[in-house]
Regions:
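Juxtamembrane/disordered regions of integral membrane proteins
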Residues: 1-145
Length: 145
């Protein structure tokens, strides 16, 4: 059970950190496209500030979506008496995050996370979900051996 919680926690944190940093870079690319200079020092500082700021809003929402998706996958796999597949966790993670942002926008009537307004920003979030899912799946698959 500890490995399950550890796998989920690591997967969620990886997804959040990568998603936050990617989202920050999408926004800063828009700023740069307007002709403003964005230094590497500014990119690092803004990324750090966004990680702290988004940890109170985006992190819990991502945690719920990812834990629900991975939990459902674990439940289905255990009933089928099949082996867990690491890349299946990555697909579930990507799917959860790719569905999360448009659903939040639909329900709330506003984009909760500005970088997901563009297809590139949304895909970057999906990749972050996949990376976190891969980490979760790797840890989970090690626990069944």
């Amino acid at each position: 059970m500890i490995r399950v919680i550890f796998g989920y926690a690591i997967g969620i944190l990886v997804s959040f950190v990568l998603g936050s940093i990617a989202g920050t870079q999408v926004v800063l690319a828009s700023v740069q496209a307007m002709g403003l200079e964005v230094s590497w020092a500014a990119r690092i500082e803004v990324s750090r500030a966004d990680l702290l700021g988004l940890s109170a809003t985006l992190l819990p929402i991502m945690a719920l979506a990812l834990a629900a998706g991975w939990g459902l996958y674990d439940g289905v796999i255990s009933r089928m008496r099949s082996d867990r597949v690491t890349h299946a966790y990555a697909l579930v993670g990507a799917g959860c995050i790719l569905a999360l942002h448009p659903l939040l926008a639909l329900i709330l009537g506003v984009d909760v996370f500005a970088p997901t307004r563009s297809l590139g920003g949304l895909l970057a979030q999906g990749i972050a979900g996949a990376a976190g899912g891969w980490c979760c799946g790797y840890i989970r698959s090690r626990s069944s051996k």
